[in-house]
Amino acid sequence: MALPLKSLSRGLASAAKGDHGGTGARTWRFLTFGLALPSVALCTLNSWLHSGHRERPAFIPYHHLRIRTKPFSWGDGNHTFFHNPRVNPLPTGYEKP
């Protein structure tokens, strides 16, 4: 048995007349401007204050890391595709900067 279309449309129309947002909008505005943005600012400041040059750790030749069973198909075969000589060691150790 089908519902009468008239009663269904009245229920939807009356729900749309209510206040949009209300206290919910105030809550999200407070969370955005009172918590989220200051938190991002503090994290940015913390990151900026602790940024700086750090000495790289001593190379320890673990036998289970940097295993080369066959050479890479690019370059000299020993460097990975996104190799950074200042950060990434080779199987024999760091490259001289």
Swiss-Prot record:
The record's listing under Gene3D superfamilies reads: Cytochrome c oxidase, subunit VIa
Q: Which UniProt keywords apply?
A: Membrane, Mitochondrion, Mitochondrion inner membrane, Oxidoreductase, Transit peptide, Transmembrane, Transmembrane helix
User: Which SUPFAM superfamilies does this UniProt record tie to the protein?
Assistant: Mitochondrial cytochrome c oxidase subunit VIa (SSF81411)
Can you tell which superkingdom this protein's organism belongs to?
Eukaryota
Question: Signal peptide span per the entry?
Answer: none
The record's note on quaternary structure and interaction partners says:
Component of the cytochrome c oxidase (complex IV, CIV), a multisubunit enzyme composed of 14 subunits. The complex is composed of a catalytic core of 3 subunits MT-CO1, MT-CO2 and MT-CO3, encoded in the mitochondrial DNA, and 11 supernumerary subunits COX4I1 (or COX4I2), COX5A, COX5B, COX6A2 (or COX6A1), COX6B1 (or COX6B2), COX6C, COX7A1 (or COX7A2), COX7B, COX7C, COX8B and NDUFA4, which are encoded in the nuclear genome.
Q: What does this protein do?
A: Component of the cytochrome c oxidase, the last enzyme in the mitochondrial electron transport chain which drives oxidative phosphorylation. The respiratory chain contains 3 multisubunit complexes succinate dehydrogenase (complex II, CII), ubiquinol-cytochrome c oxidoreductase (cytochrome b-c1 complex, complex III, CIII) and cytochrome c oxidase (complex IV, CIV), that cooperate to transfer electrons derived from NADH and succinate to molecular oxygen, creating an electrochemical gradient over the inner membrane that drives transmembrane transport and the ATP synthase.
The entry's protein name is Cytochrome c oxidase subunit 6A2, mitochondrial
**Species the sequence originates in:** Bos taurus (Bovine)
